[in-house]
Amino acid sequence: MKLSLSPPPYADAPVVVLISGLGGSGSYWLPQLAVLVQEYQVVCYDQRGTGNNPDTLAEDYSIAQMAAELHQALVAAGIERYAVVGHALGALVGMQLALDYPASVTVLVSVNGWLRINAHTRRCFQVREQLLHSGGAQAWVEAQPLFLYPADWMAARAPRLEAEDALALAHFQGKNNLLRRLNALKRADFSHHADRIRCPVQIICASDDLLVPTACSSELHAALPDSQKMVMRYGGHACNVTDPETFNALLLNGLASLLHHREAAL
């Protein structure tokens, strides 16, 4: 699997791995890259079956497989210890990495994540699946911003959204791959295993997230032994895109604090 690695800003700089959500594209994290590469070696990638890592995914494709293939690619690139920043599905992959490779994951940041899918989130995905089946890729892509962004943010950026729609259609991961990745997300359940995650965790959520209720992050916080929760008042599901200034400040402060906390504990 292809990875994109930034040059380390200094010798032995910590590594931060960015894992996007269901869309799978590493470019999702563009608003964070400029600030992160000043302090960390940053790894971005298109998830298997998407973007520049095309593949046909098996029907039983799972979050555990997503975690294993990423870890193997990191080790092959000479990276054995790393912090993980995951958004939604990416946060699930991050938790799986922390469970399966505890010696490798130094810190986990969960952005609008959950222990197991909430009934409201499941309902949103059911609607989106119906759109996919009835209207194809175009219907899926055109509906997606409604679940990602606040209404006023979208209304002020109509040309940008049109350009994003065109790009998403041109690079659509395919119906079968999308549904298999979505099914992996829906099957994931960390409610009985989260207390085994021992690395420090920063939980970031947005109070106006239409797709994932903030209660999901509260449940995560209660279940994870060494976690802290930050709530953004605005930003929607893709709060790192809509309010990068606020998000980046939380992320940079959290990473620095938790990495120091981790090193002090060793």
Swiss-Prot record:
Keywords: Hydrolase
Top-rank taxon, per record: Bacteria
Provenance organism: Escherichia coli O1:K1 / APEC
Annotated gene: rutD
General function of this protein: Involved in pyrimidine catabolism. May facilitate the hydrolysis of carbamate, a reaction that can also occur spontaneously.
Name of the protein in question: Putative carbamate hydrolase RutD
UniProt xrefs under PANTHER family: HYDROLASE ALPHA_BETA HYDROLASE FOLD FAMILY, MONOACYLGLYCEROL LIPASE
Similarity comment: Belongs to the AB hydrolase superfamily. Hydrolase RutD family.
Any single GO CC term annotated in Swiss-Prot or TrEMBL for this entry: membrane
